[in-house]
């Protein structure tokens, strides 16, 4: 006997390898059908049952597939206990259980038997499956795993065996009928072996005699489950009096009319390769639309938080100034000031530490009410990367509970916990989730409703509104924006293709042969009028937005730089420092180290030297950063103790006599008349910045020393943001749109090698020809003119340029600053959010170098220089071969043979003098004194580069150069 069966369920399991005893993992059975056939293929029994959903709902996504609604199953189904009893009787009559990909159905029914505590022999019965490597080899469909043939679907197998299509009905009775036909035909064709069927050899001959023709469907009439669900739902609506138009009170109408809309769920370019919106653009758009606030809620990170708050503050300062001038002139103010709301769309999973299985979690929006809330967001955003990263940055409910202070929550988009459970698991589970969030956040928890004209969204919104009324949770209207204007939708879709390495021609959908994409073009930054029109029947969703705005306190993320505590000897400590946080003791100790160093450097300290040192020490004291110098001299001294080569000094720090006396630099600024004011200006006190060169092999050891001294959680590297440059935007767009490679390359080469300041692709296209011509050299202008002509063509090349101009500047990836290192007084996550590096255990700040100091971070530049390693290795080799011990610090700077090398341009391996351009100018200049090398180093950079020929000519005619 053969029992062929199939089930329809509430969805898919989280883990396919979970045991049937894991009841929470396996979905529920809501329909089962079976056919019992004898060994010759004759039908003995056919049964089909809907199962009453007891204690659960059938989620919408499951209903959309098979058509069985909760209402239909409750009306026409029988209890699970009855179903299991009948199924057990059928199992007792058969030798084999049969199905298409039967393992899933066996687990579903096994889990149901376990839930009900019913014994069954099913799990020990032999299985015959129509979806195996054998049937895959029969059909030989490409695309399987590991280069094998693809496992066939029921439709594919049916079409192969009978040369006629079968549309998988996702109705258990229809699927069982088709599976039975395929199975019996496979038996007739002897695809199953006698060993598998446990039959004698003559069985197949007898089976084929009884069934000489290919098997046919038995002709069952299948119920249209979707139509049946729709019918019963309409009947229930009629009984409940639903379908009547929503009545909005006059009071709500008045409040709605006066209410201001603000976007509270927005993604910027810091949602890497997911949004085309720049931070400045979203602030400008909010102000332009008269919105009182705007939130930034990027996916999984807070990289843009500082830039966002700063952009809003700068806008508000300008708007306030303009409004003040208008009021003073007797006119009405015209500018809108905007309140920034910092948030993050977190991925909240079951256990953020569990990396044994993929669990990207649910997307839920958390927003800060104030500075304390911001720091809690930063903590969570940091943990999401440092502890929870697995495919995506993740946190879990325990982390939310720990850092929930001063936080507001929006329930999120369709991937949020509550909406997702409504669609995929069931309304009961969604309601349980809502209760948890409300228990944690009370009146700071809001249900988020979106209207993008999507069927699944409409279904979710209906349930959310019911939940809102039942649990007294307020609704908030959002639009989950990813691009600024509706016409940017195509460019955004191209960006998603760039992220996933897809062609835009690939259809949007799930599974093999499809790609990810938004379902329509409604995810743009809509105006107040557009949003109010969408929610005219649900005015409270707009009115409630002001409540969130009012809860947010204004705050700045700017702060003074915080230095880690540097331990100074007891004799230099000043008691008052403990009381008021002063740095008197550090100043005393710095003066002591400086004067001791001055004795070693100068021997006799003349009045002019003392005067210079006093001036510098006073300026350093006034800056409030003596600790900075103590920290730097400490790790440089340790580097030398570890035999790590340290550079003699680079940049403006070489102008400091204090730095020279401390051993930070090896250049005497007094001897070379270098200006201290370029390093620290007493009239404009700012954080000093010292670039320190180490040999590239020893840099890591110095880093380890700093980490051990200050603590691993107090040291971090600095993130960099990789932007999509003009040529990159063109090439990426061309690949997605399938523009031929040679054509894309030709267009990209029309872009100037070095873009003029404040120019980009969009400006080239929009500006007048005269303005473009002013910004470019003649040859560059000709190329750009051709580029503009192509952009204005109505073809694929023109479309590529037009879309690329929108994508240009989008963040493409993140990296790590080559030399920047942050040191903080305590755990760095107390100050800024962090992420992690792929090849290092060190934290990486989510804020980049452009805002690190403004955010209060002490930044050091630890540069690894290969040149220092070469010098160090050369010194060792000379000693090894000749016994002569060289000291590079004592090499003369007037050696004629060395200048001869420079004059011939033989400077490969000499830092900052080895480029082909520099070698050419060395040959022209023919340097003879150290001052020539200094001058050329200063000239060889953008700006003064054009004056090099003039400088060379003046030297050649021995005329005194003017100061440049």
Q: Which residue ranges define each predicted feature?
A:
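Short, glycine/acidic-enriched loop or turn micro-motifs at the edges of active sites
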Residues: 9-11, 104, 132, 178, ...
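Structural motif
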Residues: 2, 95-97, 262, 293
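Alpha-helical scaffold/interaction cores of sigma-54-like transcription cofactors
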Residues: 232-964
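Two-metal-ion RNase H-like nuclease active-site motif
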Residues: 2-15, 19, 264
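Glycine-rich, highly charged phosphate/nucleotide-binding loops
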Residues: 75-84, 426-430
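Mixed-charge, glycine-rich, non-catalytic linkers/tails in nucleic-acid processing enzymes
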Residues: 186-222, 559-564, 570-576
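A short alpha/beta connector and helix-capping loop motif
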Residues: 16-33, 490-499
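Metal-dependent phosphoesterase core characteristic of DEDDh/y 3'-5' exonuclease domains
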Residues: 15, 26-70, 88-211
């Amino acid at each position: 006997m053969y029992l062929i069966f199939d089930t329809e369920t509430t969805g898919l399991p989280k883990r396919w390898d979970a045991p049937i005893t894991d009841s929470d993992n396996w979905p529920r059975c809501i329909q089962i059908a079976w056919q019992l056939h004898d060994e010759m293929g004759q039908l003995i029994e056919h049964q089909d049952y809907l199962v009453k959903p007891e204690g659960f709902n059938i989620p919408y996504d499951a209903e959309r597939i098979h058509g069985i609604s909760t209402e239909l199953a409750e009306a026409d189904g029988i209890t699970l206990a009855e179903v299991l009893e009948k199924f057990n009787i059928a199992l007792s009559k058969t030798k084999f259980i049969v199905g298409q990909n039967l393992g899933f159905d066996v687990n579903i029914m096994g889990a149901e038997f376990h839930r009900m505590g019913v014994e069954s022999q099913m799990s020990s019965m032999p299985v015959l499956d129509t979806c195996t490597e054998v049937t895959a080899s029969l059909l030989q469909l490409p695309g399987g795993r590991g280069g094998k043939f693809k496992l066939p679907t029921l439709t594919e197998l049916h079409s192969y065996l009978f040369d006629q299509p079968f549309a998988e009905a996702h109705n258990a009775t229809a699927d069982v009928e088709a599976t039975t036909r395929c199975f019996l035909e496979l038996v007739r064709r002897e695809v199953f072996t006698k060993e598998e069927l446990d039959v004698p050899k003559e069985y197949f001959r007898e089976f084929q005699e009884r069934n000489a023709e290919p098997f046919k469907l038995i002709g069952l009439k299948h119920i249209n489950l979707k139509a049946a669900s729709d019918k019963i739902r309409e009947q229930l609506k009629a009984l409940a009096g639903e379908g009547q138009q929503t009545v909005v009170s006059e009071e709500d109408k008045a409040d709605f009319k006066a209410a201001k809309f603000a976007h509270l769920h927005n993604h910027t370019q810091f949602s890497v390769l997911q949004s085309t919106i720049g931070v400045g653009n979203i602030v400008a758009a909010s102000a332009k639309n008269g919105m009182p606030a705007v939130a930034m809620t990027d996916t999984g990170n807070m990289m843009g938080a500082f830039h966002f708050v700063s952009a809003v503050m700068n806008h508000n300062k300008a708007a306030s100034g303009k409004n003040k001038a208008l009021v003073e002139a007797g006119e009405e103010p015209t500018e809108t000031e905007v309140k920034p709301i910092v948030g993050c769309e977190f991925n909240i999973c079951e256990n953020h530490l569990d990396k044994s299985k993929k669990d990207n979690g649910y997307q839920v929006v958390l927003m800060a009410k104030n500075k304390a809330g911001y720091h809690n967001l930063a903590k969570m955003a940091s943990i999401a990367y440092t502890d929870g990263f697995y495919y995506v940055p993740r946190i879990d409910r325990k982390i939310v509970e720990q850092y929930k202070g001063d936080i507001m929550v929006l329930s999120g988009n369709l991937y949020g916990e509550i909406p997702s459970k409504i669609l995929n698991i069931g309304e009961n589970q969604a309601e349980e989730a809502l209760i948890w969030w409300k228990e944690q956040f009370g009146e700071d928890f809001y249900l988020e409703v979106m209207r993008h004209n999507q069927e699944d969204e409409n279904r979710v919104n209906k349930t959310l509104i019911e939940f809102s009324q039942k649990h007294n949770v307020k609704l908030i209207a959002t639009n989950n924006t990813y691009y600024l204007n509706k016409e940017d939708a195509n460019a955004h879709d191209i960006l998603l293709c760039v992220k996933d390495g897809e062609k835009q021609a690939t259809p949007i959908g799930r599974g093999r042969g499809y790609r990810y994409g938004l379902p329509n073009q409604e995810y743009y930054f809509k105006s107040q009028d557009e949003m109010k029109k969408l929610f005219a029947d649900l005015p409270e969703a707009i009115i409630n937005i002001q409540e969130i705005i009012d809860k947010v306190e204004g705050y700045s993320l700017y702060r003074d730089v915080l230095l880690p505590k540097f331990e100074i000897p007891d004799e230099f400590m000043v008691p008052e420092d403990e009381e008021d946080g002063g740095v008197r003791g550090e100043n005393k100790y710095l003066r002591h180290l400086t004067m001791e160093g001055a004795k070693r450097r100068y021997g006799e300290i003349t009045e002019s030297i003392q005067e210079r040192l006093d001036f510098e020490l006073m300026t350093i004291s006034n800056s409030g950063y003596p600790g900075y110098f103590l920290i730097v001299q400490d790790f440089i001294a340790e580097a030398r103790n570890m035999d790590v080569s340290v550079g003699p000094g680079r940049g403006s720090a070489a102008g400091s006599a204090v730095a020279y006396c401390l051993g930070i630099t090896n250049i005497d600024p007094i001897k070379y008349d270098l200006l201290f004011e370029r390093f620290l200006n007493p009239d404009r006190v700012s954080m000093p910045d010292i670039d320190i060169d180490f040999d590239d092999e020893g840099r890591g050891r110095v880093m380890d020393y700093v980490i051990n001294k200050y603590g691993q959680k107090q040291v971090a590297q600095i993130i960099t943001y990789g932007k999509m440059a003009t040529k990159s935007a063109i090439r990426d767009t061309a690949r997605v749109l399938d523009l031929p490679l040679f054509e894309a390359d030709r267009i990209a080469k029309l872009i100037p090698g070095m873009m003029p300041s404040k120019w980009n692709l969009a400006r080239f296209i929009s500006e007048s020809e005269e303005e473009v011509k002013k910004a470019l050299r003649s040859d560059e202008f000709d190329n750009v003119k051709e580029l503009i002509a192509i952009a204005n063509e109505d073809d694929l090349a023109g479309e590529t340029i037009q879309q690329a101009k929108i994508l240009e500047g989008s963040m493409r990836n993140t990296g790590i600053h080559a030399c920047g290192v942050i040191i903080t007084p305590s755990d760095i996550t107390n100050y800024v959010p962090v992420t992690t590096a792929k090849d290092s255990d060190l934290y990486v700040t989510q804020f980049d170098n452009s805002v690190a100091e403004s955010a209060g971070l002490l930044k050091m530049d630890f540069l690894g220089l290969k040149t220092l390693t070469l010098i160090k290795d050369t010194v060792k080799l000379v000693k090894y071969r000749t016994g002569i011990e060289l000291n590079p610090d004592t090499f003369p700077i007037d050696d004629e043979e060395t200048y001869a090398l420079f004059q011939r341009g033989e400077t490969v391996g000499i830092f900052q003098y080895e480029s082909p351009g520099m070698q050419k100018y060395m040959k022209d200049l023919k340097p003879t004194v150290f001052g020539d090398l200094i001058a050329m180093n200063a000239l060889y950079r953008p700006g003064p580069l054009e004056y090099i020929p003039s400088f060379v000519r003046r030297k050649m005619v021995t005329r005194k150069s003017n100061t440049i």
